Amino acid sequence: MPGETEEPRPPEQQDQEGGEAAKAAPEEPQQRPPEAVAAAPAGTTSSRVLRGGRDRGRAAAAAAAAAVSRRRKAEYPRRRRSSPSARPPDVPGQQPQAAKSPSPVQGKKSPRLLCIEKVTTDKDPKEEKEEEDDSALPQEVSIAASRPSRGWRSSRTSVSRHRDTENTRSSRSKTGSLQLICKSEPNTDQLDYDVGEEHQSPGGISSEEEEEEEEEMLISEEEIPFKDDPRDETYKPHLERETPKPRRKSGKVKEEKEKKEIKVEVEVEVKEEENEIREDEEPPRKRGRRRKDDKSPRLPKRRKKPPIQYVRCEMEGCGTVLAHPRYLQHHIKYQHLLKKKYVCPHPSCGRLFRLQKQLLRHAKHHTDQRDYICEYCARAFKSSHNLAVHRMIHTGEKPLQCEICGFTCRQKASLNWHMKKHDADSFYQFSCNICGKKFEKKDSVVAHKAKSHPEVLIAEALAANAGALITSTDILGTNPESLTQPSDGQGLPLLPEPLGNSTSGECLLLEAEGMSKSYCSGTERVSLMADGKIFVGSGSSGGTEGLVMNSDILGATTEVLIEDSDSAGP
């Protein structure tokens, strides 16, 4: 078989087999090559000559094969065949040698196979390969000596077969320790026919071309040989590097890792808090015009508050204090120059307003709808402004402050009222001639005198009405007629004792709402009645004589007296 070592056979057996092959040749003429047919009737003399040439050719072929193997090993030190079954691809016009011309000897008699089981225990595969190569050389030499030579063609075929045996042995030596080596006895006739048929292929392919193809296939199947590349284009160091083994980490490295993890966790928490704060805040508004497709709610425009510069409205009867001149212009335009054209539709109201929003705000006061509830005391209000002012009572906040005296208050109206006190010359034109206190109205001055200076009030009344007699019992009534009351001999009307008071004749008795005040004036008595009337005269337990006056005589009005009576405390 090709690729296996053959044992030498004795010359007698070879001659017998050659004779049998010659006898069987005429039976199958189509399978024998023309050279063998022509050489059959040549006789014993020609066969002896051929055998002598064969011996010399076989020896030369063995030497050439050894030289070729050494040269190939030197050129390709790493070359090996992956598997013995790998063969070069068949040429389309060429058939395999075994299938082309089966010899008649194969049909009659199969070669003997000697299978030896070889166990390698401690030997290296390379050493085994060298031993096999050394043992193969004398076997090939003996085979070549026993066979007749047919020329240079047979030497080429022996070289190729020797190469196959080397490849199979090298592959077997690398597979494992347990190897099976099969040897067969050589058949000379079969080898001769095979050699003759190699050169009669229908495609006309020579043995040199076949050897080149085999070498190319073997090189392609083997690993890429090492080549010195000056440009280092084929060098890939990352493939040759081995993965570094993981080193044991020390305690310091673990501590650093833990610190890094803690820092990362803290950073994550801080970022989450920042995101929450950003979510609470309003998103920044985009610049540019608003798209028609944009249906997001519009945010109210915010104007920057100007710096505080208090100014006062100089319009007659106003005196409103404003925080900036710009606000003053707005105030004058809408509060003094603009006409009131919006009328309240409520039947009992009819108030006029300059702006529609003022009318809508006022219309809520005519309803009982209170949508704004205090969270502290659950009190309800009709407007958010009233609720905000009320909430300051619970919080104790007083945002407004007077720049002159530091007075604080919650509402702007309170501050405006307070600021008028600092401008007494312009606003407080009426003053008390006794103490010098100033008032906005004249009636307030009269009420002040009746409360704080009653003796002056009575003296003025006596001076203005001295000796005048009032005979009308209904002084403040609607009947203007004077009625004559029963009187004593002097003609003075007899009046009942006012409030049943009895005092000494040296005191002036004033009574108002059950509160009495006395003033020493000899025998005369002045009494301020509960209905607002004044009695001046002398009174005793036996009878009373005097003058009954109305408060209008003193220049005061009943409105002032009523306002003064409602006020609590001095």
Swiss-Prot record:
Residue numbers spanned by region Interaction with MAP3K14/NIK: 338-368
Effect after changing residue 349 to A: Abolishes ubiquitination of MAP3K14/NIK
Subcellular location: Nucleus
Enzyme nomenclature, EC number: 2.3.2.27
EC class name: transferase
Listed Pfam families: zf-C2H2
Family: Belongs to the krueppel C2H2-type zinc-finger protein family.
Role noted for this protein: Atypical E3 ubiquitin-protein ligase that mediates 'Lys-63'-linked ubiquitination of MAP3K14/NIK, leading to stabilize and activate MAP3K14/NIK. It thereby acts as an activator of the non-canonical NF-kappa-B2/NFKB2 pathway. May also play an important role in cell proliferation and/or anti-apoptosis.
Protein name: E3 ubiquitin-protein ligase ZFP91
Naturally occurring in which organism (per UniProt): Homo sapiens
